[in-house]
From Swiss-Prot:
InterPro entries: CK1_Ser-Thr_kinase, Kinase-like_dom_sf, Prot_kinase_dom, Ser/Thr_kinase_AS. Isoform 1 and isoform 2 are expressed in various tumor cell lines. Expression of isoform 1 inversely correlates with ERBB2 in breast carcinomas (at protein level). Widely expressed. Highly expressed in fetal liver, skeletal muscle, pancreas, heart, peripheral blood leukocytes and testis. This is Serine/threonine-protein kinase VRK2. The lineage of its organism: Eukaryota, Metazoa, Chordata, Craniata, Vertebrata. Belongs to the protein kinase superfamily. CK1 Ser/Thr protein kinase family. VRK subfamily.
Length: 508
């Protein structure tokens, strides 16, 4: 794993303004003034000598050559952040932009008898930590949009075999040329989780535990496990909860990593209520609770369903626009009646609980328990009979779901007499707000975001509004109808299973 954040690296001696650096491609860069420092290095404005600029559009990050973080970050940029690669991805995914800083070059230089490593990157603007509220919060619409933008970035870097490992507001920067855009920077803790297509194996190492920013780092990192894609998704979930609520359950114990790990474990084990109760006045954490349910259900080497996660944060697919703190963004304060907040939280708890229970029934959770899906399959191959029975059970579940979906949905609106209106952010999100009027509006509108749940087992979106449980109730699915369906199904499947059992015994 890459070096820990708490390892002590000395900052380099400041370079004089005007010093010329030669990168490995033969390009020359003139240093401007120092504009900041990271955890391990200094950052300068930079100007290419072949194209004079009045306003610097590049920066140079400088560290001692022996420092590990810049080396890790440099390898990431060399493999992942080339301009042509990002451009092709944007076209392929039909994005307006991708929030990864562009990489322009790197090299080594000498100064006062010491060797330094430097990297030239795109210049970015201010970080979100500096522009958040006094308690570090953002509007809910902004939080959800930031989550979607970060999922775009994570999907790209995960596809290129890397994880970030240190998502937080201080590492999210606005664009310099276009402050409507947000970028994920600082890849000093980036990790190649799947070199050459071979995913790292799950292995706990307490000596490497609690790596990253303790407030947001994942449970795997607490255990000393090499980071994987689920770590980034989990970290993003904690960040969104912090940005919306202004606090996290373990903030008073940040000096005790073990206590933080325990608090995170409790939060994930007690979803969704553990997240919903942190909702600020006049808002809710339904989307974030559902997001963390999905993150917690991922196996160690499982690929997240990025589109489904985006659907959780933006269920109506409304086009993204400027962030509300950018030059064009505007916002309107939303007031939600106290009674509505109570009803919404009860409904959200009910629906997310159903979704969570369904995940538990469909997936073996013995790992978070210690093994990835791939390792488990290799170490414990199922016998033929058990495999067939498992497939039959899954098919039966799918059949029951299809049958249930064909029934007319129950009208749950009687207990929630309301309609959905929206507070509009120009070219941005519409944030749901309940008005308590006619229930008829639900016949024309789509379901609120907290009625949607995405299973990581399948790529579809299940509408939980049309169901009062994971299985049909007596009013939806009578005993005779179920029996008839089962008889027809098992008349076919039982002979097939018996034949497979016979063949298996014959050849053993």
């Amino acid at each position: 794993m890459p070096p820990k954040r708490n390892e002590k690296y000395k900052l380099p001696i400041p370079f004089p303004e005007g010093k010329v650096l030669d990168d490995m491609e033969g390009n020359q860069w003139v240093l401007g003034k120092k504009i900041g420092s990271g955890g391990f290095g200094l950052i300068y404005l930079a100007f290419p000598t072949n194209k004079p600029e009045k306003d610097a559009r590049h920066v140079v990050k400088v560290e001692y050559q022996e420092n590990g973080p810049l080396f890790s970050e440099l390898k990431f940029y060399q493999r992942v952040a080339k301009k042509d690669c990002i451009k092709k991805w944007i076209e392929r995914k039909q994005l307006d932009y991708l929030g990864i800083p562009l990489f322009y070059g790197s090299g080594l230089t000498e100064f006062k008898g010491r060797s330094y490593r430097f990297m030239v990157m795109e210049r970015l603007g201010i970080d979100l930590q500096k522009i958040s509220g006094q308690n570090g919060t953002f509007k809910k619409s902004t939080v959800l949009q930031l989550g979607i933008r970060m999922l775009d970035v994570l999907e790209y870097i995960h596809e290129n075999e890397y994880v970030h490992g240190d998502i937080k507001a201080a590492n999210l920067l606005l664009g310099y040329k276009n402050p409507d855009q947000v970028y994920l920077a600082d890849y000093g803790l980036s990790y190649r989780y799947c070199p050459n297509g071979n995913h790292k194996q799950y292995q706990e190492n307490p000596r490497k535990g609690h790596n990253g920013t303790i407030e947001f780092t994942s449970l795997d990192a607490h255990k000393g496990v090499a980071l994987s894609r689920r770590s980034d998704v989990e970290i993003l979930g904690y960040c969104m909860l912090r940005w919306l609520c202004g606090k996290l359950p373990w903030e008073q114990n940040l000096k005790d990593p073990v206590a933080v790990q325990t608090a995170k474990t409790n939060l994930l084990d007690e979803l969704p209520q553990s997240v919903l109760k942190w909702a600020p006045s006049g808002s809710s954490c339904c989307e974030i609770a559902q997001f963390l349910v999905c993150a917690h259900s991922l196996a160690y080497d499982e690929k997240p369903n990025y589109q489904a996660l985006k659907k959780i944060l933006n269920p109506h697919g409304i086009p993204l626009g400027p962030l509300d703190f950018s030059t064009k963004g505007q916002s309107i304060n939303v007031h939600t009646p106290n009674s509505q907040k109570v009803d919404s939280q009860k409904a959200a708890t009910k629906q997310v609980n159903k979704a969570h229970n369904r995940l538990i029934e469909k997936k073996v959770h013995s790992e978070r328990s210690a093994e990835s899906c791939a390792t488990w399959k290799v170490q414990k191959e199922e016998k033929l009979i058990g495999l067939m029975n498992n497939e039959a059970a899954q098919e039966s579940t799918r059949r029951r779901q299809k049958y249930q979906e064909s029934q007319e949905p129950l009208n749950e609106v009687n207990s929630f007499p309301q309609k959905i209106s929206y507070t509009q952010f120009p070219n941005s999100f519409y944030e749901p707000h309940q008005d308590f009027t006619s229930p008829d509006i639900f016949k024309k509108s789509r379901s609120p975001s907290w009625y949607k749940y995405t299973s990581t087992v399948s790529t579809g979106i299940t509408d939980l509004e049309s169901s009062t449980g994971l299985w049909p109730t007596i009013s939806q699915f009578t005993l005779s109808e179920e029996t008839n369906a089962d008889v027809y199904y098992y008349r076919i499947i039982i002979p097939v299973l018996l034949m497979l059992v016979f063949l298996a015994l014959f050849f053993l």
